Regions:
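Short, conserved structural micro-motifs that define repeat-unit consensus positions
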Residues: 39-46, 66-71, 79-80, 104-116
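Active-site loop/oxyanion-hole signature of alpha/beta-hydrolase fold enzymes
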Residues: 16-18, 23, 56, 63-105
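Short aromatic-enriched loop/helix-cap "lid" or pocket-rim segments at secondary-structure transitions
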Residues: 73-76, 139-143
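A structural preference for long, well-packed, hydrophobic secondary-structure segments
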Residues: 9, 19-24, 37, 107-120
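N-terminal cap/lid segment of alpha/beta-hydrolase-fold proteins
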Residues: 2-19
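Conserved HGGG/HGGXW glycine-rich cap/lid loop of the alpha/beta-hydrolase fold
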Residues: 21-74
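A conserved amphipathic alpha-helix that caps or lines the catalytic cleft of carbohydrate-
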Residues: 52, 93, 117-118
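Conserved hydrolase catalytic core segment
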Residues: 99-141
Length: 143
């Protein structure tokens, strides 16, 4: 059985008519930028436990459960738009890392959200890692 090396803490942030669950690892402050981990579709923040345990540097790490996943409440809708995830991420960062340029990792759908967020809020993202996110279709400026 796997033995957790770096236990997480949980918090809940009420925002946008939801109760957002956020998992935290490491100290509340660190000289390194906050590392934000975004899970993919049908996944949860706890899936990053193995990754966090493998990191050598001690730093502040946060990972939300997206709306409708894990311990975050679900909106009364049968679908979500990327704009919902982008707005949620922006508010989460304003709360947990105000004004800070973060290191952002996203897997699958989380990778897509991370790429879009870095595109619309480049001042908030210091480094970006996209794990298995798919690219968006090419467009022409006229579109």
């Amino acid at each position: 059985m796997y033995q957790v090396l770096k236990p997480s803490r949980s918090s809940t942030l009420p925002m946008r008519h939801l109760n957002y669950h956020v998992r935290h690892w490491g100290p509340d402050t660190s000289p390194l930028p906050t590392l934000v981990l975004l899970h993919g579709w049908m996944d949860v923040s706890a899936s990053y436990q193995f990754t966090v345990d493998a990191l050598q540097q001690e730093r502040r790490i946060i990972a939300p459960d997206w709306r409708g996943f894990g311990l975050t409440s679900s909106a009364q809708a049968d679908h979500y738009f990327f704009a919902d995830y982008l707005a949620d991420l922006d508010l989460l960062l304003d709360h947990y890392a105000p004004g800070e340029a973060i290191d952002l990792v996203g897997h699958s759908m989380g990778g897509n959200v991370a790429m879009m967020y870095a595109g619309v809020r480049p001042e908030r993202v210091r480094k970006l890692v996209n794990l298995e996110g798919f690219g968006l279709p090419a467009t022409r400026p006229a579109q």
